[in-house]
Amino acid sequence: MLLPLACLHGRVAQCLTSLLLLAEPLPRPRRGARARGAASTGAEAAPAAPPAKMAAELYAPASAAAADLANSNAGAAVGRKAGPRSPPSAPAPAPPPPAPAPPTLGNNHQESPGWRCCRPTLRERNALMFNNELMADVHFVVGPPGATRTVPAHKYVLAVGSSVFYAMFYGDLAEVKSEIHIPDVEPAAFLILLKYMYSDEIDLEADTVLATLYAAKKYIVPALAKACVNFLETSLEAKNACVLLSQSRLFEEPELTQRCWEVIDAQAEMALRSEGFCEIDRQTLEIIVTREALNTKEAVVFEAVLNWAEAECKRQGLPITPRNKRHVLGRALYLVRIPTMTLEEFANGAAQSDILTLEETHSIFLWYTATNKPRLDFPLTKRKGLAPQRCHRFQSSAYRSNQWRYRGRCDSIQFAVDRRVFIAGLGLYGSSSGKAEYSVKIELKRLGVVLAQNLTKFMSDGSSNTFPVWFEHPVQVEQDTFYTASAVLDGSELSYFGQEGMTEVQCGKVAFQFQCSSDSTNGTGVQGGQIPELIFYA
């Protein structure tokens, strides 16, 4: 699968670089520590170095000096035995000092003779050889023309860690050249690959992780590839999910593909309106647009498709016209379920977009209004979307004794999950004395930071049922971290309340854990109170 990887890797990886830099990355080392290791990770944009010298050349001056000294001593001894010493000749002029070594990329430096003593373990000594000219027997010229870097390496180390390198150096068709060109791998990614092979250290960054995954796949280093996938999963969110979906398909990573679909389905509107959506390839576009589980309105899908078409026209150097948009979209336009929009959505959106022909627009209007509906080339059935799930944390509810009162105070509870979910809203109790309208503010926080909130109203019918209050968009919640759900209600003072609360609740494949929140000032806790339900997608 190397050919399709190389074809699409460049453009999509460039887009994801900017998107991942916006997401929260894994903890980074301090800048000072980074600076010390920048050369070995390829982070510096060092100027192209002249052809690297082998170890024998590096040590030649010292060896020559030692030989001269030995010869002069031997000559002096012979002279003393043979007879009277001849007058000393004029001293030879001192040789000019050697020119300073040009800057190189990485760990290219001479080590003191005792470097082995300072590194007692095999791992430490082996790590020292990473990107080091000492004993290097092969050099790689990495990167595209005009942006190459020369990297020294040791065939044995690479062959032990990669079957591809083994075949390259020791197989039947082994390379005999001492310099090997690799134009399709980024220098920084190649250095990360080699650093892992020399030292087992994995140093991933948001701006190089995709290129590193490509290199790990190319040279069949599965542990590094797995680390890259794990890094991408932790960085996965709505704004980069579509790009990562495209990459996961190219790299044949089914687990990452599934994680991408979970985000895209649950947060479809945010994913489709992201900049990353406009950078995917057309095949991925078609796969997304045909997705049955997209949890958004069809008008949002249509708008996203038009945005992608405009971006594709720019990439191909075409004028942005309705004709060219139809051309770059191809069959993708006819995968949008336009007839499932409301008549108002169609009239104010797709009908005025100019991308549909007059005949198509006329036929769709007739389909909305006429008894005898015309045949359309667009799908007619609504998407199924996602069915929300509810985690109910109380075993019973009450209202007669110890009446619960909403007094504009905060009811709050903390929760954690054992896998990623998307909180869509909260289920709340209503009035215990008949129909009533409530004003409510719901909020979701993590470590004191507000992730989502909504100020709205809901009607209760006097029953003990819970009433859903939704966030504007589902909120991504990660595993093994406590979040705080809060609600502040104003309205009828008397309401139902929950009893016999549970600290742990299993909802399908998701386990919820609850604990009291210090934000709660109206009496809600684990054992009783309000916020009986969390509404989520998984």
From Swiss-Prot:
Question: Which regions form coiled coils?
Answer: none
Region described as Disordered: 29-53, 76-115
Disulphide bonds annotated for this chain are none
**Where does the record place it?**
Cytoplasm
GO CC entries: cytosol
Q: Where is the composition biased (Pro residues)?
A: 85-103
UniProt biased composition (Low complexity): 35-53
Q: Which InterPro entries match?
A: BACK, BTB/POZ_dom, BTB_POZ_BTBD6, PHR, PHR_sf, SKP1/BTB/POZ_sf
Output the SMART domains linked to this UniProt entry.
BACK, BTB
| Residue intervals passing through the bilayer | none
Q: Domain named BTB: which ranges?
A: 136-206
Q: In which tissues is it expressed?
A: Expressed in lens.
Q: What is its main location?
A: cytoplasm
This protein's source sits in the domain of life called: Eukaryota
Kindly list the biological process annotations in GO that this record carries: neurogenesis
Per UniProt, the keywords (alphabetical) are:
Cytoplasm, Signal
Q: Secretion signal: which residues?
A: 1-17
Q: What does this protein do?
A: Adapter protein for the cul3 E3 ubiquitin-protein ligase complex. Involved in late neuronal development and muscle formation.
Q: What is this protein called?
A: BTB/POZ domain-containing protein 6
What lineage is this protein's organism placed in? Eukaryota, Metazoa, Chordata, Craniata, Vertebrata
